[in-house]
Design a protein with these regions (language model features):
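PP2C/PPM-type serine/threonine phosphatase catalytic domain
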Residues: 1-152
């Protein structure tokens, strides 16, 4: 039996149809998608984790998630279930919007407010992603860190 049997991976996929002003998002796991619009940041994806489910049920407070011993336990992942239901959503896309896709290696170490401030202050997507990556690495960067940013 392979040491990797039973393991899965996360997926956050975005398809932007600018001509139709539509953003399509497919998501499974604990990587995230954020929309930055008019100076505000919104998490579009929902974490598929045990602790996220506990928060929804009122069994855990949101501020307890970061330190919970089971915070990395996924409830959905690609590769574990042939009948997996992937979250698929459609959003309106507006001129000036930005889309951030990232792994939990970033969001475990950088707050949503910090994400927003870096994106708003950056002159371009490359500068913003490099700054976010540097912030996470300086704070310990113990997990893989992937950061993709589309600035509209």
């Amino acid at each position: 039996i392979s040491e990797y049997q039973g393991m899965g991976t996360t997926l956050t996929l975005a398809w932007l149809k600018k001509a139709e002003s539509q953003l399509y998002l497919a998501h499974v796991g604990d990587s995230r998608a954020y929309l930055v619009r008019e100076g505000h940041i919104s998490q579009l994806s929902q974490d598929h984790t045990l602790v996220a489910d506990m928060v929804k049920k009122g069994e855990l407070k949101a501020e307890q998630v970061k330190n919970h011993p089971q915070r990395h336990v996924l409830t959905k992942a690609l590769g574990n279930d042939p009948w997996l239901e992937v979250d698929i959503r459609k959003y309106d896309w507006q001129k000036g919007d930005s889309l951030l896709l990232c792994t939990d290696g970033l969001t475990n170490l950088v707050t949503d407010e910090e994400l927003l401030q870096v994106i708003l202050a950056a002159e371009n997507a490359k500068t913003a992603t490099e700054k976010l990556l540097t912030m996470a690495l300086k704070r310990g960067g113990y997990d893989n860190i992937t950061v993709l940013l589309a600035i509209g």
